[in-house]
Amino acid sequence: MKKSQELMTRAKRVIPGGVNSPVRAFNAVGGCPRFIKSASGAYIQDVEGNSYIDYIGSWGPMILGHSNPKILQAVSKVMIKGLSFGAATELEVEMAELITRLVPSVEMVRMVNSGTEAVMSALRLARGYTKREKVIKFAGCYHGHSDSMLVKAGSGALVNGVPDSAGVTIGVAKDTLVAEYNDIDSVNLLFEQNKNEIAAVILEPVAANMGVVLPKDGFLEKVRQLCSQNGALLIFDEVITGFRLAAGGAQEYFGVTADLVTYGKIIGGGMPVGAYGGRREIMECISPIGPVYQAGTLSGNPLAMAAGITMLTELSENPQIYEHINRLGTKLGDGLRKITSNTVNSVGSLISMFMTENEVIDIRSAMASDTGEYSRLFNHLLNKGIYIAPAQFEAMFISNAHTDEDIEKTLSAIEESLNEMRKK
């Protein structure tokens, strides 16, 4: 790892912590981060020339696999005409039409540049539309790094938000209320304690940032009901689940309709992009036709739109892609359950193995995981050519480029690693 170590040393001189996103630093697992040089299909290659079966996929958007030829061709064709115009383009209209066709609840959509920006804008819109200020989020659900979402539960769901990062003011955090995922009573209590004050409830329909945690049967439906009864908007953060669980995302998969939905990198095949959309009457509150301001120079840029149109078209016209990734997800999940007593949560092509034998249904049960054991497993697998998330509380992503052989190699490597760990 000499070259990666040299690059990390150089990076630390000019980039805080040597990385541009904290998880890349390997702080949770130890060792030197791998600097990636290239990727193709289900594999990534580091600067030393080592190849790994990749289960990160740029944290989700590489659902077709790395360096998909159709996406690369679409981007190449567009970029020779110009990278950004700061003006409207035909491609952004086509992209919006495609999203609204695939997701029936999204009657209008606004393009932005990241999932964080989509969430930030959707929350502002919800507050502007309802003329209320408070928002309910769930402990363990991650919605990007905008100030109002960087809060934790404190002493539980009964208190106002407490800043979870230096630089976030109490004033910003106080209007963010925190409930417990899969605990509908905690949501109901917050509505009772804040009557006519809650603008929206935002959640990941499948939590994927405390590891993969599925909603209990009826949980999403009950949250939907509480929002409707109390005049609050329901916002699904589908940065992870959108166009992955199904062409219509979690709304299609679970049969629960949100008022607003946010998307991130997956709608651009890995290009920097995001979007938020929903009912027409809500979306028409956005400037330039409404009082809620939101703007972006690079929003709807042609490269991201070309990549997104190509990828979403591939997904919508080829249902066998979902059949393939879901079958492999089942194969990996079932295989893990056979070789370990650790808890394995999975849905479709999203999987997490928690280093605990206890059921994981929320952030508290997820935190019971032995992160030291996960760190050991991660490094064993890395040495065997398997690249999983460098943190316990993240998901594994399967792409259409993964094969049965990849899954079998991965299961064999995990079984070998667990056996090696037991001997030490």
Swiss-Prot record:
The keyword Signal does not apply. Keywords: Cytoplasm, Isomerase, Porphyrin biosynthesis, Pyridoxal phosphate. GO terms for biological process: protoporphyrinogen IX biosynthetic process. Disulfide bonds: none annotated. The keyword Zinc-finger does not apply. Pathway: Porphyrin-containing compound metabolism; protoporphyrin-IX biosynthesis; 5-aminolevulinate from L-glutamyl-tRNA(Glu): step 2/2. Its cofactor is pyridoxal 5'-phosphate. Homodimer. Belongs to the class-III pyridoxal-phosphate-dependent aminotransferase family. HemL subfamily. This is Glutamate-1-semialdehyde 2,1-aminomutase. It comes from Alkaliphilus oremlandii (strain OhILAs).
